[in-house]
Regions:
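Amphipathic alpha-helical and helix-coil boundary elements used as assembly
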Residues: 1-602
């Protein structure tokens, strides 16, 4: 038979230093949850209740509540501090009256509405410290096992509590309140209470569950261009013998393996392997549970109990279990009882079944840096809600076309990295707020003017002012440099114009060159050919020379025409005439005139 005296406790409840004479008390505690309590204070009648001024009870809201249990015979005790969240003054049927004081663990102060914040290249410990720094009333012990720096982390429309709960789920960290202190990360306390069935417990249940445990995750690390894949390990860490049996049964039943994207984002294969180990350990925690009804407040949230049976039952111990949920109840007469649940003590990572994972939606940001140290075309952006100089880490920029080819090892495609100061739209891979990327840039009233009337103008203009402008009305294309004075115009009417303020140079690999500058045109090549199907006209000042295919003549309007060769000059024709008012043919050494018949003065 059980020892009934263990049920009797001395319970003390104080609010603002004032002890409350209560009718009943209930305190519910659970890992990754706010604890909740209700204390009913009996004032016997409505008149007695409402003789108390409402201001007195309203002023309880937000105040600290201290609750302590102490067994009368053994002195075993448990202390809890919370915060009053609601007070009810009740009158019922004209006969009964009382006050209900509702409250929660101090973690409720982390529920200061959803907010936005971010961290870059910080450890989990540093992130938790900064996220909670304005909540000094909540005693916190942060000692997460995960110690690597996280490239980028965002608190996205989440309360501090929901944010911490999510991180607890993603990184496999413990998160709970023990009555005095909030723990993020497994605490360094492993005291074990020996609990005996039928003495300390009215009821005990050992529960084995069928739990799926086979899964795979994948992730892509862009800065290394590496795809990582990993499966869950064969077995969870820290299993006891009974867990192992339950695990083998579950593995046989669930043969299929599920696949999902990694969450959180990882930096390397080791990070993904670690994530898979957390998933497996969390599934292992659900394989075997203990549940029961207890008579002693030595069963405490977060602590270990070792459950055994009386000697006359001749049964082996059930083993050690970590308490993850417990409800304490005390009646007016001091009768105490609790209901509890626990998982095997060897559990490394505790599952968080309903952690809220935020869904990030596209939003505006401003480019702060684009000088990517790894030369991968990435940028750092700042959202409107980021303060104190905070930005994202380096994020990728979406492009209509991007990649490599056999001929192009880098920058094949469309390369337009946004400029510092540009407004951009940011999306998120898998809706994950920790994985932003730039989807495109946005014009606004100070940066855009549209495509002119009828949306006729399309353009590409760089930071310096170099431009390609398309006109859909004329069909023209204009290419200009940053000065606007050097251009190539395709006018849409079968004409191309090339214009430069100083010179135009056309050259090829063999160094044939045409140079046009302000006052001259030069041509240089091994062979230069000029062909006119009818005429070729050369003009210099007021003088011109025409090469005519019809008249077979060179006609010069100049006063003098001089033909000169330093070695030989040959003039061949079937019939030729040299005319002049005065005509001199001279050979300074010799002159020879030959022909079939030579006529002089004939």
């Amino acid at each position: 038979m059980g020892a009934s005296f263990l049920n009797l406790v001395t319970t003390k409840v104080t609010v603002k230093g004032e002890e409350q004479k209560f009718v009943s008390l209930r305190l519910h505690q659970r890992f990754n949850r706010h604890h909740a309590f209700t204390v009913i204070v009996n004032y016997l009648s409505p008149s007695n209740t409402f003789k108390q001024t409402p201001e007195k009870f309203i002023n309880y809201v937000g105040e600290t509540v201290s609750i302590s249990f102490a067994h009368k015979q053994t002195g075993e005790s448990y202390d809890f501090e919370g915060v009053v969240t609601q007070v009810e003054m009740v009158g019922s049927m004209g006969e009964a009256g009382g006050v209900a004081i509702h409250g929660a663990s101090p973690t409720i102060l982390y529920e200061n509405n959803g907010t936005l914040d971010s961290w870059m290249d910080q450890t989990l410990s540093a992130i938790i410290k900064e996220a909670t720094q304005e909540y000094g009333k909540v005693p916190l012990a942060s000692n997460p096992k995960y110690s690597a720096k996280i490239p980028y982390m965002a608190q996205y429309n989440e309360s501090v509590f929901d944010f911490m709960n999510r991180l607890s789920a993603q990184y496999g960290e413990w998160f709970y309140y023990d009555g005095k202190k909030v723990y993020f990360g497994k605490p360094d306390k492993d005291n074990t209470e020996k609990i005996m069935y039928d003495v300390d417990l009215e009821e005990v249940r050992l529960v084995a569950n069928l739990v799926p445990g086979k899964s795979a995750r994948y992730d892509y690390v862009a800065q290394e261009n590496k795809q990582h894949n990993a499966d869950t390990p064969a077995k969870p860490d820290g299993m006891n013998d009974l867990q192992s049996i339950a695990h083998d049964c579950s593995e046989k039943a669930y043969g299929a393996k599920t696949t999902a994207a990694a969450n959180p984002h990882i930096a390397d294969k080791a990070g993904l392997d670690g994530q898979m180990k957390v998933l497996k350990n969390e599934s292992g925690a659900n394989l075997l549970n203990i549940r029961g009804i207890g008579k002693t407040c030595r069963i405490r949230i977060g602590e270990v109990i070792e459950v055994s049976f009386p000697g006359d039952m001749n049964l082996p111990p059930l083993g050690k279990f970590r308490i993850t949920e417990i409800t304490h109840e005390v009646r007016r007469d001091g009768h105490y009882a609790n209901t509890f649940a626990g998982i095997p003590d060897g559990t490394v990572n505790i599952p968080v079944p309903d952690a809220k994972l935020p869904l990030a939606l596209p939003e505006l940001a401003t480019v702060k840096k684009n000088d990517d140290e790894k030369e991968q075309g990435r940028v750092k952006v700042s959202f409107d809600w980021q303060k104190n100089g905070k930005t994202t880490n380096w994020v990728r920029v979406q492009s209509p076309n991007a990649g490599v080819s056999d001929a192009v090892s880098k920058n094949r495609g469309w390369v337009f990295v946004p400029e510092v100061g540009d407004q951009v739209m940011v999306g998120y891979e898998h809706g994950n707020p920790d994985r932003p990327y730039v989807t495109g840039a946005m014009f606004h009233s100070a940066s855009g003017k549209g495509g002119d009337k009828n949306n006729k103008t399309k353009s590409i203009i760089t930071r310096s002012g170099s431009a390609i402008v398309f006109d859909d009305e004329t069909g023209s294309i204009v290419i200009t440099d940053h000065t606007g004075k050097q251009l190539i115009l395709l006018d849409g009417k079968d004409a191309i114009t090339i214009m430069a303020k100083k010179s135009v140079v056309i050259t090829n690999e063999d160094k044939s060159v045409i140079v046009m500058d302000e006052k001259s045109i030069g041509m240089q090549a091994e062979t230069i050919s000029i062909e006119g199907k009818k005429n070729i006209t050369l003009v210099s000042g007021n003088e011109s020379m025409v090469f005519s295919s019809e008249k077979n003549i060179i006609n010069g309007s100049a006063t003098n025409i001089k033909l000169e060769a330093t070695k030989e000059y040959d003039l061949n024709t079937q019939t030729g005439t040299m005319k002049g008012t005065n005509l001199t043919v001279e050979g300074t050494a010799n002159m020879t005139i030959t022909g079939g018949i030579v006529k002089i003065n004939s």
